Amino acid sequence: MNTQQLAKLRSIVPEMRRVRHIHFVGIGGAGMGGIAEVLANEGYQISGSDLAPNPVTQQLMNLGATIYFNHRPENVRDASVVVVSSAISADNPEIVAAHEARIPVIRRAEMLAELMRFRHGIAIAGTHGKTTTTAMVSSIYAEAGLDPTFVNGGLVKAAGVHARLGHGRYLIAEADESDASFLHLQPMVAIVTNIEADHMDTYQGDFENLKQTFINFLHNLPFYGRAVMCVDDPVIRELLPRVGRQTTTYGFSEDADVRVEDYQQIGPQGHFTLLRQDKEPMRVTLNAPGRHNALNAAAAVAVATEEGIDDEAILRALESFQGTGRRFDFLGEFPLEPVNGKSGTAMLVDDYGHHPTEVDATIKAARAGWPDKNLVMLFQPHRFTRTRDLYDDFANVLTQVDTLLMLEVYPAGEAPIPGADSRSLCRTIRGRGKIDPILVPDPARVAEMLAPVLTGNDLILVQGAGNIGKIARSLAEIKLKPQTPEEEQHD
């Protein structure tokens, strides 16, 4: 950003007083890296630490950030403030050093709230659909020429980044309820997509506590702000009378203010009509599959309509929407080597969904768009606690595919829990008599174990939130072909 552009931005967003050097602990995470990227473009000196390089850290280094691939006390030297992710423990040496040096230590959401303070903030919350809805709102506002700043939890594929600094007055951000830190945000508009029991350790295992936290989040809106909420969700419908703010509802329900009807899916695209109060019906072509994405689009349209964005810009943005990273991410269609006389092709799709509701939505989108395909899922459960708490739901949802291969649980730092492991889950699913799941004990054997189950007319869903995304990309690189020892050594 040049001096003239920075001066224009400062007329909208004042500098944080006496803050020059901002250090991020856990900077490689998508949410942390996105905020760091916006601040780097605003002219702040950025440094950060993480355990290993990734595309987020590379992008920040390209912007001039200093990245350390270790956690050492000296990394925070000269920092004005230290920003930490919820995944970082209090005994991290950089946090300890910052406290000893009397450097302020704040959570990611506090810095996001500071970015939002002098802008027109639009925050997208909910158990599922936040990342995609954030990208849709951002795409519509960009298409309308409003040049928004956005901070997303996933890659916005059209922009090639998780976050971007715009010159307009809007900041569009994903709001994370996993650690309740979204309570720091004070937006002008808030979307809540749905509310389910997840991250319950944050809420002392009390679902009422989680629901009240969402109410508190919405009450951070000014009295002239607006809450946009999915009335199809039973919990949101229950909470609506307790929301003391202006509300707009959306959904397939007949009483929704923005109503989805006549939904059809053809391949990767959804086609539907949106009915809005005092507006002409809007016939939408959405370049994203699944009824869940039609709901995400309805939320984005509700916000854009309230802002006065013209329908033509909305429709262009949705029809050209390129999606977000690891959300029904099409990695290619590959010819198959003949196996037992079979040949043909297999489509490969990578998806981040790791909650039963998300996995169910992905399966339904795949079935609706490609009904004749043999649906093969490679699934990696995420966290032992989630596997334990939602065990029966996972067992029910995963029986909907034709063939299931399952990796070991990705622990995300958790200790194993007896009975909440992949072997137990495979045994339970097998006992239900619909499919015979295959346990993959070693990720290096995925291609080898996948090949025999393919028919030549397949859609492979690589599903989960752990390191399974890397496995999906490696499958694409080798075009699904099992590697010989010589090929692996050559690679």
UniProtKB/Swiss-Prot annotation:
Signal peptide positions are none
Name of the protein in its database record: UDP-N-acetylmuramate--L-alanine ligase
Q: In which pathway does it act?
A: Cell wall biogenesis; peptidoglycan biosynthesis
Documented EC number(s) = 6.3.2.8
The species this protein was found in? Escherichia coli (strain K12)
What keywords are assigned to this protein?
ATP-binding, Cell cycle, Cell division, Cell shape, Cell wall biogenesis/degradation, Cytoplasm, Ligase, Nucleotide-binding, Peptidoglycan synthesis
The UniProt catalytic activity note for this protein reads: UDP-N-acetyl-alpha-D-muramate + L-alanine + ATP = UDP-N-acetyl-alpha-D-muramoyl-L-alanine + ADP + phosphate + H(+)
* Cross-referenced InterPro entries: Mur-like_cat_sf, Mur_ligase_C, Mur_ligase_C_dom_sf, Mur_ligase_cen, Mur_ligase_N, MurCDEF_pg_biosynth, UDP-N-AcMur_Ala_ligase_MurC
